[in-house]
């Protein structure tokens, strides 16, 4: 060895400090794994964890934020900003829908489809009708909470949430062939003229189980032209080939029910109230709310129909509706009211698909047994499927072992 040269030895083992650090890291990750196992598999742990976390919507009400859409150059100018202060702008297309926790997923998909396909998304104004309180004490259905979820999904959407006092109609509802048809919110469409600002002269009412695959302004403009040329209060696709008599009991017809429709402007035909354009000024002036309520009172005294909110509309309006193209309500995609079997689209062009009937696309997709037509609804679904505690735990295990 040369004079002054310092002797060095190659390390044969990890220095004590590094070894202690490695042991500490392993112990930390082991303890983290135990804590995660406790948090996500123990009810007590999960409750403690989520109590510390920021408040978030329940798992069945979580949605991703929608893409932003903007007006094309051909669109009419609208007031700046969002909110009810500009609801009276004459350039707006007014769309009314109901909101509740079970159908919220459908409502959000419907809104997304409308924004997706219209050339003027900034001119859409939505009017959401929500129950005053949750059904059976379910606070998830409080109007403010539902409105907050809608705002989180569509930050720039112009909308208003209206509280529907269900006691207005609950005493008039009779039993139906399907329990969901007895929900008071199904009758909110009868009260739109009372709920919305008087400056809103016309509104498109849509059920929550629809998606629009065309520009809704085409529906709006066509209905406006048809309503202006007639004394009608409602424009909707009509189906005169349907057996109209089956919507009422044999006792109704035996007792002279046909006289109800005498003197109408045209032959009374079936129309689906899940897609209709309403002239609210004529609705108010003609006292249509009270006309429908009177038939519901008759139904409570003696059964004259079986199908929830539809028959009273038919009794008052069939034969007085301005017909719209069938493309605006490809209905029945949810099957019938009892079995919900799969159905396909009717022949002809499609601008709006409607899963009326028992089967809803989100329920069938989640159950792993979708109908072919349900896959046409799926691209508009913004629902975030909840991850189980096992899924989260597996993620951490894979991450730290990689």
For the regions a protein language model found, what residue spans apply to each?
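Glycosyltransferase catalytic domains, chiefly GT-A lineage
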Residues: 2-402
């Amino acid at each position: 060895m040369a004079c002054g040269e310092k002797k060095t030895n190659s390390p044969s083992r990890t220095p004590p400090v590094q070894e202690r650090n490695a042991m500490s890291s392993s112990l930390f990750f082991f303890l983290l794994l135990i804590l995660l196992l406790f948090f996500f598999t123990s009810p007590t742990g999960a409750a403690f964890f989520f109590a510390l976390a920021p408040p978030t919507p329940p798992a069945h009400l979580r949605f991703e934020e929608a893409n932003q859409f903007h007006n094309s150059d051909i669109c009419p100018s609208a007031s700046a900003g969002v909110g009810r202060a500009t609801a009276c702008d004459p350039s707006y297309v007014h769309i009314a829908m109901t909101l509740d926790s079970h159908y919220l997923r459908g409502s959000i998909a419907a809104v997304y489809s409308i924004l997706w396909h219209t050339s003027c998304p900034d001119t859409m104004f939505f009017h959401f009708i929500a129950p005053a309180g949750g059904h059976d004490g379910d606070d998830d259905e409080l109007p403010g909470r539902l409105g907050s979820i809608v705002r989180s999904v569509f930050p720039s959407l112009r909308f208003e949430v209206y509280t529907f006092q269900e006691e207005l109609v609950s005493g008039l509802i009779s039993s139906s062939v399907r329990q969901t048809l007895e929900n008071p919110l199904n009758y909110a469409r009868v009260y739109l003229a009372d709920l919305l600002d008087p400056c809103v002269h016309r509104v498109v009412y849509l059920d929550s189980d629809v998606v629009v695959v065309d520009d809704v302004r085409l529906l709006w403009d066509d209905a406006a032209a048809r309503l202006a040329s007639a004394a009608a209060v409602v424009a909707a696709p009509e189906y005169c080939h349907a057996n109209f008599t089956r919507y009422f009991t044999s006792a109704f017809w035996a007792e002279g029910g046909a006289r109800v429709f005498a003197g109408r402007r045209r032959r009374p035909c079936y129309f689906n109230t899940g897609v209709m354009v309403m002239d609210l000024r004529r609705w108010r002036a003609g006292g249509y709310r009270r006309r429908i309520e009177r038939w519901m009172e008759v139904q409570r005294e003696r059964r004259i129909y079986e199908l929830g909110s539809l028959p009273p509309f038919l009794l008052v309006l069939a034969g007085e509706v301005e017909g719209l193209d069938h493309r605006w309500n490809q209905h029945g995609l949810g099957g019938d009211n009892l079995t919900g079997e799969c159905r396909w689209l009717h022949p002809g062009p499609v601008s709006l698909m409607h899963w009326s009937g028992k089967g809803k696309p989100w329920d069938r997709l989640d159950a792993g047994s979708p109908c072919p037509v349900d896959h046409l609804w799926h691209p508009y679904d913004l629902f975030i499927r909840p991850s189980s505690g096992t899924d989260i735990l597996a993620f951490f295990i894979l991450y730290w072992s990689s």
